[in-house]
Amino acid sequence: MTARTFVGLRSVRPRATPPRLIVLHWTGGTGGLARLFDVLRKTTGPRSPDGLSVHYAIASDGTTEQWAPDDLVCLHAGSVNDASLGVEVCSPGFSTGSAWAREKVLGVVREEYEDRIRGRRARMLSYTPAQTLAVTTLVERWCDAHGIPRRVPLEADGLLMRRQMSARELAAYSGVIGHYHCHETKC
């Protein structure tokens, strides 16, 4: 695992309380870690005038880089930044249905599956096997280090929640979530 830090950015700050959430993001593109690092630094908005930040990033081949220490708050998940640790996984997320894109552009075959997120049908691409191992390893380490429960949000029927959680649900929840669970514009 290598380290790269957001030197000089004000997009990280000391953490006042222990994290209780792990937020998984996908990049929505096929670029590598260097490109992602550059994009996050340059992405600004009303809540992130100095760029976005995450604690870790994972490449298609499973390479994992730490971009900020766990004891800092990163800007990656809106209202739950203070309560969370964030990881970006280099993955297109949604599928175009193109076998060429799945195999040639990404350099590895990704499984395509269909699911519902926020009430709409979506064709998704899975993580690579190396990413799955890297994400699992990182999440387990974080759960052990910070006492975060190894769980995901479930609906009353026991199935994975595929919608944004309410502010009340987020405040009461501890565990692993997707970015779409905590942000209205993420799918």
Task: Please provide the spans of the model-predicted regions.
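Surface-exposed patches in mature extracellular/periplasmic domains of secreted proteins
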Residues: 145-165
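Solvent-exposed, flexible loop/coil residues
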Residues: 131, 152, 186
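Active-site-adjacent loop/helix surface patches within enzyme catalytic domains
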Residues: 2-149
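Short, low-complexity, polybasic intrinsically disordered segments
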Residues: 162-187
